[in-house]
């Protein structure tokens, strides 16, 4: 899978959040049980707020296997019966698709267990931590750009014959932007 992902031959989606679990990912209800021949998992569950789900070919699904206490991760192909909810109407990040994802008796080969059984939570957290760093960097850049635009605007806009950058209220707002 890695070669196809890196070379953009397949698109992926990361399925962790569930309606009843929220931030406590390990309390999710999605579950996989072994098929009678033990060659497949039968996956059932629901995920929500799943980024890229509308155009993903493959889903990394965090679920419990049988009666395990901890999550595992299964690699699930869309064509195996994954169903998608309606597109979420988001305030921002319009370049990605965000939907609910449903698994109803989806048959997944046992070879598609990513890593070790019961070790999915560590996989999930490692992926989230990398994303958190990127989001922090992006938000810092957005803040710097907003500050620069605000200062430029305050130095260009005039009211009552004076640049608004000279008004105390505007200076206070700019100072707050610079320090926060």
Question: Regions from the language model: what does each represent?
Answer:
Residues 1, 27-28, 46-48, 85-89:
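Short beta-alpha junctions and helix-cap segments that line functional grooves
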Residues 82-180:
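Glycine-rich beta->alpha junctions and the first turn(s) of the following alpha-helix
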Residues 30-34:
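A structural signal for short hydrophobic beta-strand segments in well-ordered beta-sheet cores
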Residues 21, 48-54, 93, 130:
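Glycine-rich phosphate/pyrophosphate-binding beta-alpha loops
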Residues 4-9, 77:
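Soluble sensory domains of the PAS superfamily and closely related sensory modules
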Residues 19-29:
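Active-site-adjacent elements of ketosynthase-type condensing enzymes
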Residues 40-84:
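A short core secondary-structure module
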Residues 8-16:
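A short, Trp-centered hydrophobic/proline-enriched beta-strand micro-motif
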């Amino acid at each position: 899978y890695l070669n196809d992902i890196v070379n953009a031959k397949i698109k992926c989606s990361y399925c962790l959040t569930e309606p009843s679990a929220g931030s406590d990912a390990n309390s999710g209800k999605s579950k996989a049980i072994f098929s009678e021949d033990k060659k497949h998992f039968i996956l059932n569950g629901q995920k929500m707020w799943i980024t890229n789900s509308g155009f993903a070919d493959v889903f990394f699904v965090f679920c419990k296997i049988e009666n395990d206490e901890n999550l595992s991760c299964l690699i699930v192909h869309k064509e195996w019966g994954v169903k998608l909810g309606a597109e979420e109407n988001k305030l921002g990040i319009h370049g990605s698709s965000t939907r609910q994802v449903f698994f109803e008796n989806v048959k997944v080969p046992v070879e598609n267990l990513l890593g070790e059984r019961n070790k999915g939570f560590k996989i999930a957290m490692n992926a989230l931590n990398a994303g958190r760093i990127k989001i922090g960097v992006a938000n810092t850049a957005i803040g710097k750009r907003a500050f620069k635009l605000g200062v430029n605007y305050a130095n260009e806009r005039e009211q009552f014959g004076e640049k608004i950058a000279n008004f105390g209220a505007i200076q206070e707002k700019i100072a707050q932007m610079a320090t926060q």
